[in-house]
A protein has these predicted regions:
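A short, basic/flexible loop-to-alpha-helix module at the beginning of a structural domain
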Residues: 1-8
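N-terminal Rossmann-like FAD-binding beta1-loop-alpha1 element of flavoenzymes
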Residues: 8-36
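Short hydrophobic segments within beta-strands
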Residues: 13, 38, 119-120, 177
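Glycine-rich FAD pyrophosphate-binding loop
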Residues: 27-51
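Dinucleotide-binding Rossmann-like beta1-alpha1 core, especially the glycine-rich loop
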Residues: 56-156
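Helical element adjacent to the flavin cofactor pocket in flavoenzyme catalytic cores
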Residues: 171-199
């Protein structure tokens, strides 16, 4: 059995957004730490971080209804949405920091402003969405969220979803107009460029 003589302070498995972000954070905190990063595919960011393999919403909790489950008592728990959104805000701050430090790091290449819409039908789902909206609206992270049951307004928010619908069908939607779409594969590549010759 061959014994490797390579030594490193930190071994990271996976060259996606999480592995590269961890490598970046470590190097920013202590540039002397030796990191080895391994990826089984032929390039970084091709599995879960790849644009077509990921929702790309930034997982900000704006439109992910499963982040605000309703309990058996009928109460909606928004805690997960608040936690996820605050973590996403930290990601945005870190990318802003990298952008100020490295000229090659341009968040505009992987972040696009994209409204986040949740659309529901029927009394039960509309009641859930309205309760969710009223709870989230109270928190500063969700202050820009809007709610509507007006079909014309919803058509302006998400026109393709409303065409040809039954005029008598009850519908409701929420929108956060300052949502984002993230290409985590491209973000992985941008972070890797800041790590060139460092790991």
């Amino acid at each position: 059995m061959h014994e490797s003589t390579n030594t490193s302070d930190c071994l990271i498995i996976g060259g996606g957004i999480m592995g590269l972000t961890l490598a970046s954070l470590i190097k920013e905190l202590d540039a002397s730490i030796k990191i080895d990063l391994y990826e089984k595919l032929h390039d970084i960011g091709l599995e879960s971080s790849e644009a077509l393999n990921n929702a790309g919403t930034g997982h900000a909790g704006y439109c992910e209804l499963n982040y605000t489950p309703m309990g058996k008592d009928g109460k909606i728990n928004i805690q997960k949405a608040l936690e996820i959104n605050s973590k996403y805000e930290i990601s945005l701050q870190y990318w802003s920091y990298l952008s100020s430090k490295y000229k090659s790091f341009d968040p505009k290449k992987f972040i696009k402003k994209t409204p986040h819409v949740s659309l529901v039908f029927g009394d039960q789902h509309i009641d859930f969405l309205k309760k969710r909206y009223l709870l989230l609206k109270k928190h500063h992270l969700f202050k820009s969220i809007q709610f509507s049951q007006d079909k014309k307004e919803i058509s302006q928010w998400a026109s393709l979803t409303m065409g040809g619908r039954n005029l008598h069908q009850k519908v409701a939607a929420t929108i956060v107009k300052d949502g984002t779409d993230i290409d985590f594969g491209a973000a992985s590549g941008a972070i890797l460029n800041t790590l060139k010759n460092k790991i």
